[in-house]
Amino acid sequence: MGALCSSETYMLDKETYKKQVEHNKMIEQDLDKDRKLKILKLLILGPGESGKSTTIKQIKIIHDEGYSVEEKLIRRHGIFMNILEGIEEIHLAVGRENKSYKNPLSFDHIHEVRMFTENFKKADEADKILGAEVINAIQKYVKDETVAMMLRDKTVYNIDDSTIYFLDNFSRIIQKDYLPTEEDILKSRVPTSGVIQYKIMLKNFNFKIFDVGGQRAQRRKWLHVFDDVHAVLFITSLSEYDQVLREDATVNRMKESLNLFEKICNGRYFINTAMILFLNKIDLFEIKIKHTNITVALTSYKGPQERDSALDYIRKRFVSLNKNKKRSIYEHVTCATDTEQIQVVIDSVIDVVIQHTMQKVGIQ
């Protein structure tokens, strides 16, 4: 009886063996799909100062726990540095535009700021506060009629928006108990060096988000994060069409961005990768287009000097660079510092990444 039972069991296994192997293979395939979906990699690329790091900050504020008190205290030092660098930026713009100070003491104020900045860079973190003398120098400097005029017409003279913001909030920032707000952090600038990785749970999926330095010298560091990327978010600044690269004053920023997008979009690493395009800084673009035509960068543009027409032309220029006609470019016009607007856009981006990845591994 026992032998019969053994024989029947053997015969049953033999008959179903092939089906069992096929079933196990299907299970392994499903597990493999789960493994592939376990971590989704989103690579954020684009030229320097386009808004990549600001977008990362928004994701942290919207979908994570925001910034702790300790993190805000660390950011405070960076904001002080942004103000000091902003004053130097204004001074350089005065010379670049062949303007003259109305107050001859403005040169003394600049000297005070420069001396303080050098010491600030060398100081220990605990000592990085704005002293009374440099505060006084900054307050007097921005009252110079030439400086005040340039700050009012910031887009004409390409004064960074964060510089304007921090100077507008200077009286609050210099208080001894100053703790940066989330808006302060969004406006702050810390150039990304190399590749910075963030891990975050978004809509029940584990994401790895890579923020990559956009300056030319940083781009060679992109290569090792290209493997198995599920989506690329390319961010470009709409408002910098009349500006040149910091690292090369002969190269227009808009042209550089178009060239970079073309290389990334059609690169061998991203043949099957979802491609998302942020046309960022629409708020500054709307101001600048009123006095500066996009023809300074895009000479083939023949349309009117107004927002919608110029924006549509820029959008089409970017999209036309995609040589893979089977792949869509998911475009969004954004203002990365506008939390309410960017929340809707980021949610859409997350959905695109998840859906594209599921389709890629065969999960519909």
Curated annotation (Swiss-Prot):
It comes from the Eukaryota. Keywords: GTP-binding, Lipoprotein, Magnesium, Metal-binding, Myristate, Nucleotide-binding, Palmitate, Transducer. Residues 276-283 are annotated as: G4 motif. GTP binds at residues 46-53, 186-192, 211-215, 280-283, 336. Residues 41-54 are annotated as: G1 motif. Residues 184-192 are annotated as: G2 motif. Residues 38-364 form the G-alpha domain. Residues 207-216 are annotated as: G3 motif. GO terms for biological process: adenylate cyclase-modulating G protein-coupled receptor signaling pathway. GO terms for cellular component: cytoplasm; heterotrimeric G-protein complex. GO terms for molecular function: G protein-coupled receptor binding; G-protein beta/gamma-subunit complex binding; GTP binding; GTPase activity; metal ion binding. SUPFAM superfamilies: P-loop containing nucleoside triphosphate hydrolases, Transducin (alpha subunit), insertion domain. A lipid is attached at C5 (S-palmitoyl cysteine). Disulfide bonds: none annotated. A lipid is attached at G2 (N-myristoyl glycine). Guanine nucleotide-binding proteins (G proteins) are involved as modulators or transducers in various transmembrane signaling systems. Belongs to the G-alpha family. This is Guanine nucleotide-binding protein alpha-8 subunit.
